[in-house]
From Swiss-Prot:
This is Epididymal secretory protein E3-alpha. Its main location: secreted. It comes from Homo sapiens (Human). The gene is EDDM3A. The keyword DNA repair does not apply. The keyword ATP-binding does not apply.
């Protein structure tokens, strides 16, 4: 009897640990997306430079192309919320409701630096199974932004 109680106690403890992991890791893809693609409006858009950004972010070192989004974070997060605001799109492709500023970085191997292209663009996001943006799928440039 006591051994079966110990087993049930261990199983209950493991279940609690699993539930805790599910709750705390729910938005892990969203946090990773923001860490890699988000540019805060606390600085001017023109102040962001590809060479600096690509060097500062460890996960981007060595990449030949990357895209950054300059916007308030909740505008990006809102892309995965349905029109009524009552539910999230899950495992779906969704176009952001308005144009966002985008900084694209392209590696020039002959000049050994990144070139920049800035634009107002419509962005298609992928909403993950947790209902948060986890990837950029497509881009439609509306208007280039000159430096």
């Amino acid at each position: 009897m006591t051994s079966s109680l110990k087993i049930w106690g261990i199983l209950l403890a493991l279940l609690c640990i699993l539930c805790r992991l599910c709750v705390y890791s729910n938005n892990i893809y969203w946090r990773e997306f923001i860490k890699l693609h988000y540019l805060s409006p606390s600085r001017e858009f023109k102040e962001y430079k590809c060479d600096v950004l690509m060097r500062e972010k460890e996960a981007l070192k060595g990449k030949s192309f990357h895209m950054f989004i300059y916007s308030l974070w909740f505008k990006i997060q809102r892309a995965c919320i349905n029109e009524k605001g009552s539910d999230r799109y899950r495992n779906a492709y969704v176009w952001a409701p308005g144009a966002l500023k985008v900084l694209e970085c392209h590696w020039e191997k002959y000049n050994n630096r990144y070139t920049e292209s800035r634009s107002f663009s419509y962005i298609e996001f992928h909403c993950g199974v947790d209902g948060y943006v986890d990837n950029i799928e497509d881009l439609r440039i509306i208007e280039p932004i000159s430096n």
